[in-house]
Each structure stands twice: as structure tokens, then as C-alpha cells.
């Protein structure tokens, strides 16, 4: 198992395949293990890297998670790139990981070849969606299948991980709000936005409004909304998603 040091804590990462570096970024309450089914499709031609953000998966735990969570996670991605000596990378972010990927592209434009941002909430936190997340996780912890999945992702302390994540999400919505420190007009690399029209996490029409908003701010953005499939779209529409990514990155 591979780790690198980040501000006194160990971050877990894995590498598969050869070629240009392509980093896959997991979402909230998940870990890099979520990408197990999709990695083989990308590792044929790319040097695929996955990582567990601090507090998640096989990375070190934190006594308290940062409030500006996704911005902080973007710094961890760049720290991994510095550690490995990656000058230019491709990024695929899923859900919360998509917010991280966009933050990296906005804050470190010289490090990015292209980005895919899949199934994410928006430009700023929504109070109604945040409350839905909080309530949904509370009840989900009573679901045996959900609990088993999280134990695979994080280990025996999965419930503490979920609670810490939820606390950070709620605190961010209350005290920070914005997911990004810079406007999309400052993007300097191609970004593909993807989501499913049937995503159960968000209201109907969520992605149409969000993607129109982003694409109106920058010529670097393109979008695709899958007609069917649950959250996240990259897993529920895997084959089509992979094909679109290969066209972007190859």
C-alpha cells in the first residue's frame, strides 16, 4: 500500500497502468474503492491514480474535518501531484469529487489537461439539498446494505466517517456556501460536465439549469445529461461515460 505525507497525516493512493496521469476523485462518504469497476477501462491507456482524501478510506483520520472541505481536498490532490512529480494531469471527479476537480482546475490551471465533473450539487450549497443530505444519511445508516457498503469503503469506523462528513457538509453550507473561490470565467482547460436526468439526489431539472449556468460563463465547458440512471451517472451509465472520457483525454 502506498501513502504520502500531507501536513503530518498519511494519504493513501494507488496506481494502475501506464501513460498520461489520470486521477479519479471519490465523492463524499465514499472512498477510492468506488472506482474498482471502472478503473480497468481507463488503465488500458492511462496511468490511473486513485486516492482517499484525509478522513476517508485507508487515509489517516482527522479529529475534525475542515469546513471548506472540497477546496481543502483540492490541495491534497495537488500535493499528490507534487509528490509524484506530475506536471499535467487529467481529472475525473464524482459527486463531491467533481467539486474538488473543478477547484483544482480553477486554482492550478497550469497543472490540468482536462477535467470531467460528474453528478455534483452546484456552484454553491443549497440549504434544501444540504438538509436532504443530512436527513437521508441519518436514515441510510439504518439500511443494512448501505452500512455494508460503507464498511467496505472505510472499515469498522465507517459511521464516524459518515458523521464527520455530514458535519462538514452542514457547516460548509452554513458558514461558507460557495464551493469555489474563483468564477468559472477563469477556467483555462476543457471541462466536461455530466449527470443523469434521473439522479435521485437532486430536484428534477437540476443539471439542465446548473450546466447552462456554467457553460454560459466559459467556452471551455461542455455538458452531457444521461436520460436514465441513478447517482452517480458515471457508474450508472458506465460504458457511455467511459467512451466520452476517452474522447476527451486520448
PLM feature spans:
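Short alpha-helix in the alpha/beta-hydrolase fold that links the catalytic acid
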Residues: 180, 189, 203-214
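Active-site loop/oxyanion-hole signature of alpha/beta-hydrolase fold enzymes
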Residues: 50-90
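Flexible "cap/lid" loop of the alpha/beta hydrolase fold
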Residues: 99-107, 111-145
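Short beta-strand/loop motif that positions the catalytic acidic residue
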Residues: 187, 193-195, 199
Amino acid at each position: 500500500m502506498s501513502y504520502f505525507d500531507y501536513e503530518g497525516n498519511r494519504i493513501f493512493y494507488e496506481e494502475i497502468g501506464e501513460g498520461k496521469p489520470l486521477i479519479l476523485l471519490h465523492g463524499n462518504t465514499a472512498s477510492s474503492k468506488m472506482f474498482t469497476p471502472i478503473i480497468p477501462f481507463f488503465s488500458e491507456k492511462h496511468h490511473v491514480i486513485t486516492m482517499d482524501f484525509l478522513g476517508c478510506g485507508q487515509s489517516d483520520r482527522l479529529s475534525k474535518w475542515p469546513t471548506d472541505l472540497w477546496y481543502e481536498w483540492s490541495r491534497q490532490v495537488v500535493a499528490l501531484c507534487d509528490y509524484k512529480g506530475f506536471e499535467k494531469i487529467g481529472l475525473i471527479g464524482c459527486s463531491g469529487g467533481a467539486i474538488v476537480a473543478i477547484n483544482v482546475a480553477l486554482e492550478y490551471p497550469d497543472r490540468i489537461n482536462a477535467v470531467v465533473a460528474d453528478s455534483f450539487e452546484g456552484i454553491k450549497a443549497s440549504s434544501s439539498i444540504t438538509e436532504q443530505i443530512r436527513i437521508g444519511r441519518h436514515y441510510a445508516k439504518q439500511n443494512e446494505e448501505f452500512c455494508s457498503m460503507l464498511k467496505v469503503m472505510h472499515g469498522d469506523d465507517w459511521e464516524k466517517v459518515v458523521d464527520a462528513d455530514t458535519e462538514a457538509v452542514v457547516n460548509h453550507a452554513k458558514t461558507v456556501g460557495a464551493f469555489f473561490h474563483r468564477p468559472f470565467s477563469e477556467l483555462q482547460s476543457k471541462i466536461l460536465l455530466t449527470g443523469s436526468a434521473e439522479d435521485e439526489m437532486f430536484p428534477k431539472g437540476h443539471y439542465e439549469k446548473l450546466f447552462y449556468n456554467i457553460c454560459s460563463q466559459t467556452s471551455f465547458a461542455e455538458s452531457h445529461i444521461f436520460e436514465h440512471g441513478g447517482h452517480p451517472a458515471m457508474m450508472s451509465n458506465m460504458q457511455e461515460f467511459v467512451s466520452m472520457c476517452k474522447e476527451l483525454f486520448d
